[in-house]
Amino acid sequence: MFFWLLLRDRLGTRELLRRRNMHLPSYDCACCTLDVEETLSHLFLTCSFAQDCWLKLNVIFVETDPFLALEEIKTQLHLPFYMDIIILFCWSIWMQRNDFIFKGIPPSPERCLQNFRKEFALVILRAKAR
């Protein structure tokens, strides 16, 4: 459901809330110190926090276009299940963002990677159980 919402630009970013005329004190990204509106592209690709997270996965990309960035990530991962990794990693970034906004827990690239590993291990276990 998460990635379906992301692909259709329906994930509850601050930009989407602004477009839906919801008033917030700020529409800037909560995960970085830049005064940049929190868009999907920013949150998952160009945000300094997101880039630090991707770096923990040994993925570096310079593209800001989402489709070209996906191609760069695919090339660097060299795995047939690269989309599973991308989806789970975006989910981990999203959860870090939500923990900060709703619980006041500062985002951490290390915790993002740790959460990704836990989620990925669960995916592997479910796949083996079938």
Predicted features and spans:
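K/E-rich alpha-helical interaction surfaces of small helical-bundle regulatory domains
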Residues: 90-104
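Short, conserved non-catalytic motifs in the polymerase core
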Residues: 27-36, 67-79
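C-terminal domain-tail junction helix/linker
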Residues: 105, 110-130
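Short cysteine/histidine-rich zinc-coordinating motifs and their immediately flanking basic loops
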Residues: 40-46, 58-62, 106-107
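Cys/His-rich metal-chelating microdomains
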Residues: 32-36, 50-53, 97
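Conserved, non-catalytic sequence blocks in retroelement Pol enzymes and Pol-derived host proteins
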Residues: 16-24, 37-41, 76-85, 101-111
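Helix/loop segments that flank and initiate small ligand/metal-binding modules
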Residues: 1-37
